[in-house]
């Protein structure tokens, strides 16, 4: 019997080109899995897209002095060209800046609000009097108050991986040079993850027979030691998805990119259905408890996909369907259709370059587009597959790349074929 298989792959930010670490981390393993299930005769839907919102994208546009729309579309078109040339077989690669994604994301927000999993609260955020605006997330950098890392963002430290409280950041400075900063109060919506913690733990425990320990074990351990805490899901920004609240003051706020970008896995399936023969086909993967969903991401996104994303889906419950796609005959209380939860999250570790961490800012990377101008995609796919960082970080080594292609792909597999 055919299975419904959703291949959901991490959405790259529209602020940099993709390198071999991005490809072997999520796009290539997702493509390999999709090809395998297609060969088995299963119904596969493979989706992803360009993450077009959030401070990484607006900062890139600010740096170039160009409109955000122009910048994100340039990167988006570049991603599509790269995937085509590299043989990544997406059914749909879209963006988060579509009318459909806006509607789906706002419906999830309203469903969580209806079900009592959100609350409003004032908090202190960094404000630039010179620029006359709040500077959220990546617009402010400083020293992490947990591990002492000097390049921490106001919302998260990439060194220790902790979510940060902006007002506790040490030595804060505006990345855009917007003068001195001060703390001011602003109101935001918070997703009350603490209410959903028991459900998230059960979700993970129910998948203990097939999820990697680097994913399952680490996520459960973090929940046990730290718990799930409320997290703000709106921001003071002028670019992104409007908060669906018709009150004065909220027209200047947007949904937080980490809240709405993951909803793209759902909205992309809906968009694919809208351009296919059956507009409700997305339900086969998203309103079907027998469907299996596989999420291919990097290790830096593990905890988020194992905690907040399933929490959003479970918290929205059947209210999402009532809001987004109401049935002419509403289901009895407690019998509404709920969204399908992830089956597996096979996250990969990182690929380094000759022993050093890949860094786009230092131009220490093997860029996908450049590699394809010199080498055949099959040679690149082979090396990235056999050297995939599934259990631990791996390393791109030029000498090994040549040797494994000559000695294995050509001499061994080529002669066998």
Which residues are covered by each model-predicted region?
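Glycine-biased, low-complexity coil/linker segments
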Residues: 331-335
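Structured secondary-structure scaffolds
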Residues: 2-48, 100-104, 160, 170-324, ...
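Long, compositionally biased low-complexity repeat segments characteristic
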Residues: 325-329
């Amino acid at each position: 019997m055919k299975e419904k298989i959703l291949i959901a792959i991490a959405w790259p930010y529209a602020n940099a080109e993709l390198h071999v670490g991005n490809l072997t981390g999520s796009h290539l393993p997702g493509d390999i899995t999709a090809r395998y299930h297609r060969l088995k005769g299963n119904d596969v839907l493979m989706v992803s897209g360009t993450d077009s919102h959030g401070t990484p994208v607006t900062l890139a546009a600010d740096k170039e002095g160009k409109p955000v729309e122009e910048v994100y579309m340039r990167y988006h078109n570049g991603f599509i060209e790269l995937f085509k040339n590299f043989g990544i077989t997406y059914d749909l690669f879209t963006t988060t800046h579509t009318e459909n994604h806006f509607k789906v994301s706002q419906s999830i927000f309203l469903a969580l609000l209806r079900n009592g999993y959100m609350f409003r609260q004032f908090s202190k955020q960094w404000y630039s009097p010179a620029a006359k605006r709040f500077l959220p997330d990546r617009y402010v950098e400083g020293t992490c108050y947990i591990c002492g890392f000097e390049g921490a963002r106001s919302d998260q430290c990439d060194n220790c991986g902790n979510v940060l409280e902006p007002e506790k950041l040490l030595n804060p400075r505006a990345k855009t040079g917007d003068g001195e900063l001060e703390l001011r109060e602003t109101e935001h919506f918070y997703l009350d993850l603490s209410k959903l913690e028991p459900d998230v733990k059960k979700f993970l425990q129910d998948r203990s027979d097939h999820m990697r320990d680097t994913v399952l074990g680490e996520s459960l351990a973090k929940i046990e030691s730290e718990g799930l805490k409320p997290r703000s899901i709106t921001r003071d920004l002028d670019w992104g998805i409007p908060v669906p609240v018709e009150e004065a003051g909220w027209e200047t706020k947007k949904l937080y990119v980490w809240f709405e970008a993951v909803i793209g896995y759902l909205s992309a399936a809906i968009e694919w259905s809208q351009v296919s023969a059956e507009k409700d086909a997305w339900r086969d993967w998203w309103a079907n408890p027998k469907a299996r969903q596989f999420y291919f991401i990097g290790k830096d996104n593990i905890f988020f996909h194992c905690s907040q994303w399933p929490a959003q889906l479970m918290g929205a419950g059947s209210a999402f369907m009532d809001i987004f796609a109401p049935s002419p005959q509403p289901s009895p209380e407690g019998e509404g259709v709920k969204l399908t939860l992830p089956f597996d999250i096979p996250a990969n570790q990182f690929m380094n370059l000759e022993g050093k961490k890949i860094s786009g800012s230092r131009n220490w990377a093997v860029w996908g587009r450049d590699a394809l101008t010199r080498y055949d995609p099959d040679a690149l796919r082979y090396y990235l597959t056999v050297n995939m960082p599934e259990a631990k970080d791996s390393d791109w080594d030029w000498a090994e790349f040549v040797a494994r292609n000559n000695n294995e792909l050509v001499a061994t597999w080529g002669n066998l074929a």
